[in-house]
A protein has these predicted regions:
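Glycine-rich adenosine-cofactor-binding loop
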Residues: 2-21
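Short active-site oxyanion
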Residues: 3-4, 32-34, 66-69
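Short hydrophobic segments within beta-strands
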Residues: 6-7, 37, 72, 152, ...
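Short alpha-helical
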Residues: 11-14, 42, 77-78, 108, ...
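Short amphipathic alpha-helical segments
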Residues: 17-19, 48-49, 81-85, 127, ...
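NAD(P)-binding Rossmann-fold cofactor-contacting core
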Residues: 23-46
Length: 213
């Protein structure tokens, strides 16, 4: 049996824990939840819920033979940062897939990724490692999501659409078929992307246009 450590005990970490103990793998006894890794030892103080313990900071943890990990960081850059720390220690990662998700048997989901409930992953979709697909997302056929990508709730990606590494599509955003967004891109909530988007840009609106902060 494997022992899951969730890296991050803040809001997303708690949501990941709630999902992890409802997966079929957990119910089948494939793993237990050993605890959280977080530098803030009192991150769970004062909260309702029966949470596993915060063991120590990720940087201080020594990987054990039956350990598996999930990086529960909402920001892609921090997800990548801590994934690389754990990987350098020899750690291995688990993907968490909610039972209510609809996933085509031809889809590929990279290690350490999260597929939330009621999302639809269509034919020949490829999702990279440590990516997040939130509630009620619809990924059309042949869609590609890069490593550390984030697709927030109620978003839609048409056939052959592509999302680059460390990019985020915020709530209810749309990427129409055959269009691509590059690496480190942010698409604002409710935006409709109708053209390719280059690396590092922030776009917002319908149709989505470049914005500067």
């Amino acid at each position: 049996m494997k022992h899951l450590l969730i890296v991050g005990a803040r809001g997303w970490g708690r949501e990941v824990y709630a999902a992890a103990i409802k997966t079929q793998a957990y119910l089948d006894g494939e793993y237990t939840v050993k605890g959280f890794l977080d530098s803030k030892q009192d991150a769970l103080a004062g909260l309702r819920g029966d949470y596993p313990p915060i063991i120590c900071a990720p940087e201080d943890y020594e990987v054990q033979p039956d350990d598996i990990f999930f990086i529960a960081m909402g920001e892609p850059k921090w997800r990548k940062h801590y994934a690389e720390i754990i990987e350098a220690k020899g750690g291995h990662f688990i993907s968490i897939i909610c039972k209510s998700a609809s996933i085509n048997k031809t889809a590929i989901i990279g290690e350490g990724s999260f597929i939330s409930g009621w999302s639809c992953i269509s034919d020949n979709v490829h999702i990279g490692k440590h990516a997040i697909v939130h509630l009620f997302c619809d990924l059309g056929h042949d869609v590609k999501i890069g490593n550390y990508g984030t697709i927030e709730a109620y978003s839609f990606l048409g056939g052959y659409a592509e999302v680059g590494e460390c990019s985020t599509m915020h709530v209810r955003s749309t990427l129409i078929r055959h269009k691509k967004i590059g690496n480190n891109v942010e698409v604002g909530s409710s935006s409709v992307v109708m053209r390719n988007v280059k690396d590092g840009l922030h776009v917002f609106g319908n149709p989505a246009k470049i914005i500067n902060f």
